[in-house]
């Protein structure tokens, strides 16, 4: 939005050309989203408390969580507002990737918002049925996959790449649609499952999003992409503004979500953030890197799958409780210890993911 204005003004004063630089707009995206979160956050929390939009807590979970009942939820709306405003202000709005990523994020946020609303309306922690939620996630996921497939402007956009092996490139053809659906919906649910402790999901999301900003910037630059042996995807570089906005909004939200949390993001935030990471991985052609950097999300999801399968087949549980973070809580780990250790693991995994840029 502002980019068009600055392009017009640069005809009268060349100093406005500085806003053409992606790095500057990314920094401004971070700061804008961060400021919005700081300014709007307190008022939103007060309003959520006023209307009694509070968290519904499972009675079969760790007993320490019972004190969280009534804490304002749906704070993820703050993240979405900050990301949307910042992205629209500083991105090149003629870029198709910007619109795809932003719309996927907002649509998954809408699904999560409806889920949160139903939990509040009926006074329990169930919300939408798993089948209904999965159906609408799949609708958006498949629609996005089909859109990306039929608007692809180069073969690289539908090719599967394997990190560490620069010569391994598999042209997916129509299978790209299935992979894209799986990555977006899978990432969305993985982040949602991880969002069970104060700040547990948002910090890894910020770290992974920041790393994808690096991948987007390098993949959108022909010289850098060729030097590093990564896919060159024209136009994807402008997503560094979106990832910057996501980092800024996430840090701003963490200010209020850090232990002990003043607000929870709810499904409106968790489903949206996971979908955002998924679609970022798809358009930068770094699906495997998402699995590496988002290892915490992957393990949390696998713990749930393993728990369910084991119980159905043998009647026994592998973990004291799933997702995995609850297992450690029931082992006696204080909540802050679980959170920070999962953060540390994510930092390490993100560094490993970034290292794949050079190890090819």
Swiss-Prot record:
Protein name from the UniProt record: Phospho-N-acetylmuramoyl-pentapeptide-transferase
Gene Ontology MF term list: metal ion binding; phospho-N-acetylmuramoyl-pentapeptide-transferase activity; UDP-N-acetylmuramoyl-L-alanyl-D-glutamyl-meso-2,6-diaminopimelyl-D-alanyl-D-alanine:undecaprenyl-phosphate transferase activity
So, what pathway does this thing act in?
Cell wall biogenesis; peptidoglycan biosynthesis
Protein function = Catalyzes the initial step of the lipid cycle reactions in the biosynthesis of the cell wall peptidoglycan: transfers peptidoglycan precursor phospho-MurNAc-pentapeptide from UDP-MurNAc-pentapeptide onto the lipid carrier undecaprenyl phosphate, yielding undecaprenyl-pyrophosphoryl-MurNAc-pentapeptide, known as lipid I.
Per its UniProt record, the required cofactor names are: Mg(2+)
Topology in membrane: Multi-pass membrane protein
List, alphabetically, the GO terms of the cellular component aspect.
Answer: plasma membrane
The entry's family comment says: Belongs to the glycosyltransferase 4 family. MraY subfamily.
Q: Which reaction does it catalyse?
A: UDP-N-acetyl-alpha-D-muramoyl-L-alanyl-gamma-D-glutamyl-meso-2,6-diaminopimeloyl-D-alanyl-D-alanine + di-trans,octa-cis-undecaprenyl phosphate = di-trans,octa-cis-undecaprenyl diphospho-N-acetyl-alpha-D-muramoyl-L-alanyl-D-glutamyl-meso-2,6-diaminopimeloyl-D-alanyl-D-alanine + UMP
What Pfam families is this protein classified in?
A: Glycos_transf_4, MraY_sig1
Q: Name one GO biological process term.
A: cell division
Q: Which InterPro entries does the record associate with it?
A: Glycosyl_transferase_4, PNAcMuramoyl-5peptid_Trfase, PNAcMuramoyl-5peptid_Trfase_CS
Q: Transmembrane stretches, by residue range?
A: 26-46, 70-90, 97-117, 134-154, 168-188, 199-219, 236-256, 263-283, 288-308, 338-358
Keywords per UniProt: Cell cycle, Cell division, Cell inner membrane, Cell membrane, Cell shape, Cell wall biogenesis/degradation, Magnesium, Membrane, Metal-binding, Peptidoglycan synthesis, Transferase, Transmembrane, Transmembrane helix
PANTHER family to which the protein is assigned, alphabetical:
PHOSPHO-N-ACETYLMURAMOYL-PENTAPEPTIDE-TRANSFERASE, PHOSPHO-N-ACETYLMURAMOYL-PENTAPEPTIDE-TRANSFERASE HOMOLOG
Enzyme Commission designation: 2.7.8.13
Instruction: From the Swiss-Prot or TrEMBL record, state where the protein is found.
Output: Cell inner membrane
Q: Which domain of life, per UniProt?
A: Bacteria
